[in-house]
Amino acid sequence: SPALDDEHNDNFLRL
């Protein structure tokens, strides 16, 4: 899950 990935976590929190 990219949303839970530290590297792509920003995308999930940018919601």
Swiss-Prot record:
Keyword Secreted (UniProt): yes
Function: FMRFamides and FMRFamide-like peptides are neuropeptides.
GO biological process terms on file: neuropeptide signaling pathway
Sites of Leucine amide modification: 15
Name listed for the protein in its UniProt record: Extended FMRFamide-12
GO terms for cellular component: extracellular region
Domain of life assignment: Eukaryota
Similarity comment text for this entry: Belongs to the FARP (FMRF amide related peptide) family.
Compartments it resides in: Secreted
Sorted UniProt keywords: Amidation, Neuropeptide, Secreted
Chain segments annotated as transmembrane: none
Keyword Ribonucleoprotein in record: no
